[in-house]
Amino acid sequence: MSNRVIIFDTTLRDGEQALAASLSVKEKLQIAMALERLGVDVMEVGFPVSSPGDFESVQTIARTIKNSRVCALSRALEKDIDAAAQALSVADQFRIHTFISTSTIHVESKLKRSFDQVLEMAVSAVKYARRFTDDVEFSCEDAGRTPIDNLCRMVEAAILAGARTINIPDTVGYTVPSEFGTIIQTLFNRVPNIDQAVISVHCHDDLGLSVANSITAVQHGARQIECTINGIGERAGNCSLEEIAMILATRKGMLGLETGINAKEIHRTSNLVSQLCNMPVQANKAIVGANAFTHSSGIHQDGMLKAQNTYEIMTPESIGLNRNNLNMTSRSGRHVIKHRMEEMGYSEHDYNMDALYEEFLKLADKKGQVFDYDLEALAFMEAQAEEDNHYQLQQLVVQSDSTEGVATATVRIEVGGEIKTEAATGNGPVDAAYNAIARATDRRIDIISYKLGAKGVGQNALGQVDITAVYHEQNFHGVGLATDVVEASARALVHVMNLTCRADKVADYKQSMQKNRELGGV
């Protein structure tokens, strides 16, 4: 048996079922092209019979994608198969995926037929799909709850009818790994023509076991895993592609299996899907979460600096990230602070380590996470633990034209003790406020991240805005709190402005320090 596991991505079909709004054809094509770069073997991109929009997107993707096999879903109905075949006909290579329910509860309650009638429908559908392509996949919906005798009969009949891939879904995420592995093993033991098809699995995450069940299945002979980027999908989601890919890569020595996935594209693809689908990835998500390669514990950080594999079983570079993050918090040791200062270009003779670490701990207790620019300021500025509020927002007034979408903002800001008033327009109230603040401060920064949240519950909650901005090729993080979202946004920007002002002072100090070195000074 081959040790190659086929990766069947269904982000654009099953994954899209989790979205509040459908993706546009252009957005689906963007994701499809990213999946092609990622190296998925098969991508299921829609359900053509369901709507003209889905038909168009399947056809557009089928026409464009060359290096992955494009697949479309159909029920075990001729009209569904016709629509799938027509949409896919423009592709160089394609697959028709047809399915029918096989569990007793589905057969009796949903289909209202006998199992024998359902089996006949499945056989007819597979034979009909084979008129259009040799690559036909058949799925036994709710296989995880199907009586094993019935499942074996269905699989044997579908293979005999011409299916070259047989998919065994745990549609409602009900099984546990030992149980699901037994199902796969039983199929291999009892279905006489099983060697004529690839056995696939499609596991849902209702009990959080989709990845574990999928790995167990390939250990028992399955050779295709159906999955989605970031694990998105109906209800609790699907098996996560990035987790499967990195499990098989990281544990190749034990599992003896491999995929064709280009792992360095994982991070980029995850971000794209998250943004286009408007589904943020939870910070502690395996592989692609913001904290996946972040270390805050002082003991862990010290170990990481000595040898990365003390606390990392894979590298961030392996999924396309530049490096891991050592969050500087009150739990960070002196070794971490010294390491960060060295990375920023400072030798231990440039600052007083004892004084710096003492002030660092004070600031970390006060604000939680300390950033590089904080550390520089602590090392070289007076009143080290206090932020230099060169800019202070005094007043913000916003007027918005709901019909045109143009807003006007007027701000009064104290700039180094001098009061300045400026007005500006923008595409919405937040944009207008930002433009007015930029005018008043005469300081331009690029916002690369804007996150809106809340502090508190109900009517008493405060709007919290977190922004990340780039200034002189360095990232700065600002936070604003207010009952009004626009005001919170303005306060976050002013926070960043103060940080950049302080960074400029640090840069001037560094420059003078460098001149003293060159002149032989202390």
Curated annotation (Swiss-Prot):
Organism domain of life: Bacteria
Any one biological process term the GO annotation gives: L-leucine biosynthetic process
Keyword Transferase: yes
Entry-linked Gene3D superfamilies: 1.10.238.260, 3.30.160.270, Aldolase class I
Localization: Cytoplasm
Pfam family, one: LeuA_dimer
InterPro entries assigned to the protein according to its UniProt record, in alphabetical order: 2-IPM_HCS-like (IPR050073), 2-isopropylmalate_synth_dimer (IPR013709), AIPM/Hcit_synth_CS (IPR002034), Aldolase_TIM (IPR013785), LeuA/HCS_post-cat (IPR054691), LeuA_allosteric_dom_sf (IPR036230), LeuA_bact_synth (IPR005671), PYR_CT (IPR000891)
PROSITE patterns: AIPM_HOMOCIT_SYNTH_1, AIPM_HOMOCIT_SYNTH_2, PYR_CT
Family matches, as CDD domains: DRE_TIM_IPMS (cd07940)
Coiled coil (UniProt feature): none
Pathway of action: Amino-acid biosynthesis; L-leucine biosynthesis; L-leucine from 3-methyl-2-oxobutanoate: step 1/4
Cystine connections: none
Keywords on record: Amino-acid biosynthesis, Branched-chain amino acid biosynthesis, Cytoplasm, Leucine biosynthesis, Manganese, Metal-binding, Transferase
Cofactor: Mn(2+)
EC number of the protein: 2.3.3.13
One Gene Ontology term, aspect cellular component: cytosol
Function per UniProt: Catalyzes the condensation of the acetyl group of acetyl-CoA with 3-methyl-2-oxobutanoate (2-ketoisovalerate) to form 3-carboxy-3-hydroxy-4-methylpentanoate (2-isopropylmalate).
Subunit organization: Homodimer.
Protein name: 2-isopropylmalate synthase
Organism ancestry: Bacteria, Pseudomonadati, Pseudomonadota, Gammaproteobacteria, Alteromonadales
Gene giving rise to this polypeptide: leuA
